[in-house]
Amino acid sequence: MRKVYIFDTTLRDGEQTPGVSLTVEEKVEIAKQLAKLNVDVIEAGFPIASEGEFKAVKKIATEVEDPTIAALARAVEKDIDRAGEALRNAEKNRIHTFIATSPIHMKYKLRKEPEEVKKLAVKAVEHATKYTEDVEFSAEDATRSDWDFLVEVYEAVIDAGATVINVPDTVGYATPEEFYELVRYLRRNISNIKGVQISVHCHDDLGLAVANSLSAIRAGADQVEVTVNGIGERAGNAALEEVIVALDVRRDFYKVKTDVNLKEIARTSKLVSHLTGIEVPPNKAIVGGNAFAHESGIHQDGVLKERTTYEIIDPKKLGFSGSKIVLGKHSGRHAFRKKLEELGYSLTEEHLERAFKKFKDIADRKRWITDTDIEAIIQEELTKSNGKLKVEIIHVTSGKVSTATVRISMNGEERIEVAWFKNGPIDALFSAINKALGEEFKLREYRVSSVTSGKDSLGEVLVRVEVNGEIFVGRGLSTDIIEASA
C-alpha cells in the first residue's frame, strides 16, 4: 500500500497564528511530542526571522531524533545559509525554499517577470544543495498560478536538485475538484517527476483545507503538510489529526497508509493547545470535547448497546479514555440508569422513575449535568419523605416589599395564601406557606449551598423548623433556590 508522508508545520506555519509566540523550550517540547507521534518531517521554523527562531531550529535539530528536521528559507542566499547553519546537527535535515509564482504575486509583491522568478527558484535550490541533499521547493500561491508555468518552474528546480516539490494553496482558494485536477496535471506533465515527491500545503480560508489535502492524495500527492489542531495563518491549515484519521478510517477508499502513531493524537493536540493558548473548539472533529460525546437519548441508547452504531472511530485508538455519555435534556432512561450504575447506585423502579423525572426537570434549566448533580438528585430522592403535602406552585417577587404566592395541596385539597414582608423573598415565602398550612412554625436553621459551580449550578437548601415543639428537617434541590427553599 502506498505511503503518504506527513510533514508537520505546527512550529512554523502554526506559530504564525495571531497571538501565538512559543519559547525555544516550548518548541522543543512540541517537536519531541511530534517525534513520538511519528511524523516524517518536522518544519521547525524560519531561522532568518529572528535569533530566537534560529536557536529553536538549531536546538530541535540537535535534540530531536528520527523525523527529518526542516527549516524554511526564502529564495534568498542569506536565508538559505541561515537555515543550513541551524540544521547542521540534525540527523536528517531538509531546506524548504520558496518563491511566489502567481501573476498577482509576481506583479505586485515581487515586481519580477516570470523568467526571472524561475531563475531565482533554480538558484535557490542549487544553493540549498550545498547544505543538504534533501531540498523542498514551494511555488507560493500555486493554485492561482498558470499551470504551464508551474510545470516549467518545477522541472527547472528538479533539474537543480529539488527532491520534493510543494504545491501550496496559500490563500485557501482551491476547491477539492480543482486541486485534484491540478495535482494530477502536474504528475502527468512534469517530465522529470520520477523519484521526486509531490507535496501539498492547504490553507483553510474557505474551510476546505482538509478536503483539498485528501483530494490531492487521491490524485497522487506523496506528502501532505499539516498542523496540529489546524492552527496557522488566518483561518489556519489542514488539521493533522483530521487528515490522518480520515486516511486511516477510510483506508478502503484512499488506499494509502501513514506511519503516524494514532495513540499519540490526543496527547499531541492537548499539548499544542496548552502551549499556544489556542483552545480546541468543542465541536472540532477528532479532538474536540464533543467529538465522542453523545447527549441524544436515541444515540446514547445505540452507543450503549453497540458503540459503532454512532461512532466510526474508536476514541481509545487515538489516546482518549473513551466515549462520553453526556446527560442533558435529550437523554433517555437507558443513559440515566447507566450513569447511576457507574456512580454505584441501584434504585428501585419507583425511585428511578422519580429521580429521572427530577433529572429531566433540572436538565431543562441547566446546560451541563455533572456527576455531582446526579448524586445530589439521588440523595434527595432517597431521603425524601412520602408525605401528603406538596408545593404545587410558587411565585415570588422581590423589591422594597417582597411578595410570595404559593399553592399547596394537602390530602388532595388545594390552599392558596399570599404574604408580603419587607424582609425579603424567603421571609415572604415561609410566611405564605405558614398561612397556607394553618400552622405556626419557627425557622430554626436555613442553609444554602452550591452543589456545583457556574451560574446555572444546582442549589441545595436545608431547612430546620420547629412545629409544636417538634423539629422537622427538609432538603430541597433546584437551580432556583427559592423553589428549593419551599
UniProtKB/Swiss-Prot annotation:
Annotated keywords: Amino-acid biosynthesis, Branched-chain amino acid biosynthesis, Cytoplasm, Leucine biosynthesis, Manganese, Metal-binding, Transferase
Record-level GO cellular component terms: cytoplasm
Might you name a Gene Ontology BP term for this protein? L-leucine biosynthetic process
User: Per its UniProt record, what Pfam families does this chain match?
Assistant: HCS_D2, HMGL-like, LeuA_dimer
Q: Where does Mn(2+) bind?
A: 13, 201, 203, 237
GO MF term list:
2-isopropylmalate synthase activity; acetyl-CoA C-acetyltransferase activity; manganese ion binding
Q: Could you tell me which SMART domains the record lists for this protein?
A: LeuA_dimer
Q: What is its main location?
A: cytoplasm
Q: Ranges for the Pyruvate carboxyltransferase domain? A: 4-266
Q: State the compartments where it is located.
A: Cytoplasm
Q: In which pathway does it act?
A: Amino-acid biosynthesis; L-leucine biosynthesis; L-leucine from 3-methyl-2-oxobutanoate: step 1/4
InterPro entries, from UniProt?
2-IPM_HCS-like, 2-isopropylmalate_synth_dimer, AIPM/Hcit_synth_CS, Aldolase_TIM, LeuA/HCS_post-cat, LeuA_allosteric_dom_sf, LeuA_bact_synth, PYR_CT
Catalyses which reaction(s): 3-methyl-2-oxobutanoate + acetyl-CoA + H2O = (2S)-2-isopropylmalate + CoA + H(+)
**Which PANTHER family does its entry note?**
2-ISOPROPYLMALATE SYNTHASE 1, CHLOROPLASTIC-RELATED, HOMOCITRATE SYNTHASE-RELATED
Tell me which family the UniProt entry assigns to this protein. Answer: Belongs to the alpha-IPM synthase/homocitrate synthase family. LeuA type 1 subfamily.
- Give the protein's biological function: Catalyzes the condensation of the acetyl group of acetyl-CoA with 3-methyl-2-oxobutanoate (2-ketoisovalerate) to form 3-carboxy-3-hydroxy-4-methylpentanoate (2-isopropylmalate).
Under the heading HAMAP family, the entry gives: LeuA_type1 (MF_01025)
Q: What is this protein called?
A: 2-isopropylmalate synthase
Give the organism, scientific name: Pyrococcus abyssi (strain GE5 / Orsay)
